[in-house]
C-alpha cells in the first residue's frame, strides 16, 4: 500500500564515472531512504490511491550460496548489507527522534549485480542474476506492528489481521486438499471481529511444507462452520474426514526423537471418519483466537507418544473423547456391526523400526513431488 512502513523493490543502475562500466540488479530500498534517493511512493495506474506502483519488499527467499561466499571474500561490505540509520521513530514526548542502526539482509542483492560495459536495454533486464518473485503478500509475511484498539475495525498490521491472513492461506490450502469449509472471516470482517473466524485450521509445517505434499496427505472431507482442526503431526493419512467441532492431534515426536526421522515418529491414519462435538465455546468473551487462548466445550483429542500410531476408519467420534497412545503401540479403532458410533479399540505392538506405513517421495515428470503410501506392516 502507498505510504506503508516497508521497503520497495527497484531496478538499480550504478555507473563507474571513471571506467563508465555499469552494474545492474534488482534490490531493496527501505522506506526511510525513499526521500533521500528521490523516490516518490505513488499509486499504480488504475489502482485507485491505495496500491503502490512498486512491489513491496519482503525477504530473500532463494540465494546461490557459492556466489555469496565468493562475494563475502571479495568485499567486507557484503557482510553488512543495506546499512542505514532509521530516524523514523520518536522516542521522547517532545518528538525527539531516536536513531536505530539497521542492516537489511535483502540488500545482499547489491553484491550480486551484473557488470556491463554499456547501458542495458529493457530486454536485458530479464537476464539479471537477481529477480523478484511475485505472489500474494500473505503467502510470505503478515506483520503485526500495532495492537488493535477497542472498536477499531481496521485489521491492517494487527494480530487479528495477521491471524486472518493465516486462515486465508489455510483456506486456499484446504481447497487444494478438496476439503469443503466456510469462509475464514465468517462472511465479513465485522463478523470476524465480533464472533471469531469461520473456522480454525493449523498444521505442523513438517507435514509439507509444500502444499503439493500436504494435499497428498490430506484428501477430501469437510469442516463445518466454527470448527477447529489442529494437526501437530507430520505423518498423516487423512481421507474423507468430516469435522463438526474440534479435532486435535498432537505428537510428542513430530519428526523423530532427537534427529529427523520418518520412522521414529507418531503417525495417524484417519479414513472415512466423522468428528462431532460442541467444539470451541464461541460465546466466551475472554477468547483471544489469534493467540490460541480460547475455551472449548468439547473436543476429540489424540495424543501420540514417541512412535505411537492410531488407525481410525469408518467411525464417528462423538462428544468429548480423548485417546492417548503410548510409545511402541498402535491403536486401531473400528465400528462394530456397521454402527459408526459403536466403536472397538484394539492395541497392537509396533515392531521396532518398522511402522505400519510411511510416505515415499519421488520427483514427478514436471519436477513436482509425488508421495506414495507404502504399507510396511499391517
Regions found by a protein language model. Give the residues of each.
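Left-handed beta-helix
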Residues: 2-378
